[in-house]
Amino acid sequence: MARIAGVDVPREKRIVISLTYIYGIGKQTAKEVLAEAGVSEDTRTRDLTEEELGKIREILDRIKVEGDLRREVNLNIKRLIEIGSYRGMRHRRGLPVRGQNTKNNARTRKGPSKTVAGKKK
């Protein structure tokens, strides 16, 4: 496995797919990085030369990925919680943040359902 931005990317896959294993790099960003580095998208990771890998690493060093990006996202969420915004309150309570309806769904965010005892007759 080639190591790029602190992540072991798969050797057998095409480089454009391998780069998406890095947190913060999607398909579009991977294509832009490869275009700037002058590497074909169809090249397998194992077929890259050290020079090409060096170019890709150099370009990715300028982009916020992995630990730096995760830290920034967590700090943004902490900031929302500290200032007491509506979004911060939703984060704190573990509810959907972006206005989704929670009457019936939102099980992923709310966790498994807790059964409430029904009213006795």
UniProtKB/Swiss-Prot annotation:
Record-given protein name: Small ribosomal subunit protein uS13
Gene field: rpsM
Organism: Listeria monocytogenes serovar 1/2a (strain ATCC BAA-679 / EGD-e)
Keyword terms: Ribonucleoprotein, Ribosomal protein, RNA-binding, rRNA-binding, tRNA-binding
Molecular function in Gene Ontology: rRNA binding; structural constituent of ribosome; tRNA binding
Biased composition (Basic residues): 106-121
One Pfam family cited in the UniProt record for this chain: Ribosomal_S13
Record's function text: Located at the top of the head of the 30S subunit, it contacts several helices of the 16S rRNA. In the 70S ribosome it contacts the 23S rRNA (bridge B1a) and protein L5 of the 50S subunit (bridge B1b), connecting the 2 subunits; these bridges are implicated in subunit movement. Contacts the tRNAs in the A and P-sites.
Family: Belongs to the universal ribosomal protein uS13 family.
Stretches for region Disordered: 91-121
BP term (GO), one: translation
One GO CC term, this protein: cytosol
Subunit and partners: Part of the 30S ribosomal subunit. Forms a loose heterodimer with protein S19. Forms two bridges to the 50S subunit in the 70S ribosome.
